[in-house]
Amino acid sequence: MKIEDSYGRLLTQSQMTNDLKEIAQELPAIEKQNGRYQCFRCGSLIDQKLWKLSEEVLYCRACIQLGRIRSDQKLYAIAQQNFEGQELLNWKGTLTSYQQEVSDGLIQAVKAGKHALVHAVTGAGKTEMMYQVVATAIKAGKAVCIATPRIDVCIELYGRMKKDFSCPISLLHGESEPYFRTPLVIATTHQLLKFYQAFDLLIIDEVDAFPYVDNPILYKAAQNAIKKEGNTLYLTATSTDELDKKVKKKEIIRYSLPRRFHGKPLVVPEIKWVPKIREKIEKGRIPYELLQLIKKQRKTHYPLLIFVSEIELGQQFTEDLKKYFPKETVVFVSSQTTDRLRMVEEFRNRAITMLVSTTILERGVTFPFVDVFVLESNHKLFTKSTLVQISGRVGRSKERPTGKLLFLSDGITREMKKAIKEIKEMNQEAGF
């Protein structure tokens, strides 16, 4: 590793060289706080009975995948340095007046040293609204990171930023190439655990998504990764209670955009009664009501994305679909699918016509012209936030700002009602 690649990084003792020790700040690996021991890197409280190597030496089990932290060793931080400022924005598109208002507000918030929340509907163009504030920071020689909880979203975002920004960009996730220092970093939120006071601007996209939401370890990671005088921007289509509280306390500024970039309303889900979905699928059959809905949709020749709650159900349903629709190309994807990215791209290009997915594709991916069905939308896994995100896959393209969006179930849950209510309220706020 080059010395400059360690700037802004949080390193364990085993990662240190003599050259690095000369410029590093020593930090306690495990601190004692009010009689309890706490990991400096991830903030976890240490179980003194179980998390120990000997009677005298404790370690942190919570973040051990990043390298073991021991109470008898130190952590080391190498101070971040400014970059050489540069013009770097290649994007030739234009923002709508609504998007421009948010973009300008974010630039002013950063100049004023404020943190901000962008609460914008799915398909509002949140990424494009970030371009100017990112470009402004990098032009001033600042270090910027865009972090998101999901690898799929991270990789798709990296591809877009590579196309629209000319500066070097590093991509960081569990399966990525080794890190090298760049003015712009695209990373999963877990990768923030490897940084310390590294970024002048930290943008956390999909802040409501698992595994970031309600995860104190990842909150600590974000807190450590930002410089003391740095700014954090949060992006979401479904805000969290914690962020709403911060807005009320005026700890962060809120910018809301209830209108999609193409100016059309959000597609509101329809609820369709389909009894015994799971029972029939597990027997190798597709419920009659569901079969008729799929047949009707396939006559349109638009791609069909079907969400399921569990991997086993998705696998069985995909096999059932192949039997009933032998002329269609049907594929199932989940977190366990090794070539998921290729399949997603083939679905986008219509080489795959019907895609069955777990909630791994609930957010961060765009499929023009797509229709969406949610099987067992009354399943406990389908929370309001998840259903709003899934609904946001429909109607995202200017060429087809509408689409078929069905919640298929044999009951209506509070989460389903709340999701539909929120979508209708956003449309109302946008003037529809």
Task: Label every model-predicted segment.
Residues 199-273:
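Post-DEXD/H (motif II) to motif III coupling segment of the RecA-like Helicase ATP-binding lobe
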Residues 206-209, 344, 348-401, 409-414:
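Conserved RecA-like helicase motor core of SF1/SF2 enzymes
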Residues 91-114:
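N-terminal pre-P-loop "Q-motif" helix
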Residues 251-314, 318, 330:
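Conserved interdomain linker/interface between the two RecA-like ATPase lobes of SF2 helicase motors
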Residues 28-82:
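Interdomain "pre-motor" coupling segment immediately N-terminal to P-loop NTPase/helicase cores
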Residues 228-242, 391-422:
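Conserved segment of the helicase C-terminal RecA-like domain
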Residues 111-133:
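Walker A/P-loop
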Residues 148-156, 160, 170-180, 187-194, ...:
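Conserved helicase motor
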